[in-house]
Amino acid sequence: MSEPLKPRIDFAEPLKEEPTSAFKAQQTFSEAESRTFAPAAIDERPEDEGVAEAAVDAALRPKRSLWRKMVMGGLALFGASVVGQGLQWTMNAWQTQDWVALGGCAAGALIIGAGVGSVVTEWRRLWRLRQRAHERDEARELLHSHSVGKGRAFCEKLAQQAGIDQSHPALQRWYAAIHETQNDREVVGLYAHLVQPVLDAQARREISRFAAESTLMIAVSPLALVDMAFIAWRNLRLINRIATLYGIELGYYSRLRLFRLVLLNIAFAGASELVREVGMDWMSQDLAARLSTRAAQGIGAGLLTARLGIKAMELCRPLPWIDNDKPRLGDFRRQLIGQLKETLQKSKSSPEK
C-alpha cells in the first residue's frame, strides 16, 4: 500500500545563510620595517618571587629621588663654601706669614681631597652599576632583535669589561662561529652560549666554595657570635668576588644595602623556596634524624649563602638568563650535604684512631 502524501509546510522565516569567516586585509612590510621589527618580550619571572626580586633589584639599581638631589645640591654648596673659605685662610696665612695656620690649611686640603676622591669613587661605582643594568636591558632587546650590526660590538665590549683576552679559546670559538649574515639575536645568543658560561662557571665555583665554608663553619663552631660575624664577612666577600668576576665594582652603600635586603628577603619571601628545595631530600634520606642541630643549621646557612650568591650573580651578569641556565639551590644542595656528611664522618673516625 502506498503512503498518503504529507501536507505542504510553509516556513515564514527565510533560509539562514552559512556564516563566512572574515579575512583580514593583507599587510606588507618594507625591508627597513622588517629589520626594525622586534617581538614583545614576555616576562617569565615567577609571580611568587616578584616581591623578593623587586626588593633586591632596588638594592642594586641606584634610585634618583628629589631628596637625593636636594642633599647632593646642599653638599655641593657646602663643599664650595669650604673650598672658598680655605682659599681665603690660605691667602691670609701667606700674607701674614703665619706658617702654623698655613700648615693647617694644607692638612685640611689633603683631608678634603681624600674625601672628594672617595665621593667620586663611590659615584663612579654607582654609575657603573647603573650602566650594567642598562646593558642587561640592551642585551634583552638585542636577543629579540632581527637587526644587524650592533650585536658584535656589544659582545666585544662585554668581553673587554670582563677582562677576557682576545686569545681566549671561548672568544676565539665565538669569532669563528659568527659571520656577517647573522642578525644581532644570533650573535648575542652565540656569545651567551660560548663565552658567558666561562664567567658563570667561575661564579658557580665561588658560590659553592663560600657556601661550603659557611656550612662547615656553622656546623663545627660552638660560638653563635663568631658564626654571625664569619657569615656576614664571607657573604660580603662573595658579593665583591662575583661583581669582580663580571667586571664591575660595588659601592660601599649599595653593597651593604644589598646584603641586608637579600638576607631579609631570603628569610621571609624565600622561605617557601627553601622548604621546597630542601624538604624532599631531608624527608627521603632522614637527614633530620642523622644530623645534629648544628649540622642542620650549617646546611641552612650554606643555602642562604648560595641564594645570596645566585642573586648577586644574576644582577651582576651583563646578559639575562636564557634557556633555563639560571643556577638553582638544588645545584648546590647535594654538594653541601655530601661535604657535611664527609666532614662529620671524618670527625667521628678520628677520635677512634
Swiss-Prot record:
One GO cellular component term: plasma membrane
* Residue intervals passing through the bilayer: 70-90, 100-120, 213-233
The subcellular location is: Cell inner membrane
A Pfam short name: DUF697
Q: Where is the composition biased (Basic and acidic residues)?
A: 1-19
Keywords in alphabetical order: Cell inner membrane, Cell membrane, Membrane, Transmembrane, Transmembrane helix
Coiled-coil regions listed = none
Segments of this protein annotated with the region Disordered: 1-35
What is the topology of this protein in the membrane according to its UniProt annotation?
Multi-pass membrane protein
Task: Give the protein family.
Answer: Belongs to the UPF0283 family.
User: What is this protein's record name?
Assistant: UPF0283 membrane protein YcjF
Q: Which organism is it from?
A: Salmonella choleraesuis (strain SC-B67)
* Gene that this polypeptide is encoded by: ycjF
